[in-house]
Amino acid sequence: MAVAFPYTPFPFNVTAISPSFRLSPVSVATNVSLGWAPSCATPECLPTASWSTSAINSTLSFKYWGWDVALDGNVKGNMSVDLFNEEGRIIWNPSGDKLFSLRGGPDDHLQRNITLRVLDASPGSQLTVTRARVNGSSRGDYTWPADRWIVPSDNDRLSYSGFIPQTSVAQAGSPTTYSSSTAGDSVSMQFNGSAFLIYGPCGPTNGLMRVTVDGNQQTVNTSKPFASDDCLLFQSPGQNIHNLHQLVVENVDGRTLGIDRFEFFRIQLYQRSGSANGKRVAVILCTIVGAIVLCSVVIVIYVRRSVKRKMNPEADRPRAGHRGFMWLHL
């Protein structure tokens, strides 16, 4: 998505199998007339599956941290849909493969919640949601360069307590998935970044996951009606990049919790993108260096003169027949 004002988002896509989505009702029989149903139901297919419904009173809610959001999908037939967020009702005007897009405010420090509800539907009509596209929270209130990298679950920087390594079924950036079925099991690490995502399996056997960053806790229910090999389990709010953060992920209720990989994002505050900004930074740096050099030269000259005066105090006394310095003749 294009941005409406200068900032550096953390862009990512997510499908409705993620715990960030809440769908109701869900048709386990994959019958769209009864509620939301996925386009496929196998664990390897669900990470990219679309979800459809023809049922009146079907609802979808999506929570995210960030500025902008767009929901991709389509509508077949005639449907009346109510769309709103925490600030009120949003105009529902789907076009092509995009159901709606929403520009955020001038900050990304709040968690947003988008909800849609099917109010009425003609026979044979159907609403399909393929994915959400998010310009996520990063605390980057200008256009800055940024780094993005993946930390697989078998990385040495991660410290586990009670988790068991298994071969990753998803193979989406990590060869290993660490799994826990005991309350209190945890994984921890330190990081310096602007934001992060956590990926892993989700499904009926999964439970509560607690994520703690520098003492701030959030609990996520990773249980879903269908089993999926790869889900976006958690999106963090933007973080202060000037600090080294402590991250802890815990199994809360003893149900299954799997960690496949972490994805981190970090803005480079002192390297604005664009040639003009680069030249401006270069000029500022040269000015600072020049000022430091000038101050050093002045200090050296002053010290040398002070040493000479101490070694030859007669040199500073005025000669006879003169009043003061030569250039002060009256």
Regions found by a protein language model. Give the residues of each.
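Glycan-recognition surfaces in beta-rich domains, encompassing non-catalytic CBMs
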Residues: 1-282, 290-299, 313-314
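Intrinsically disordered, low-complexity terminal tails of fungal membrane proteins
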Residues: 301-330
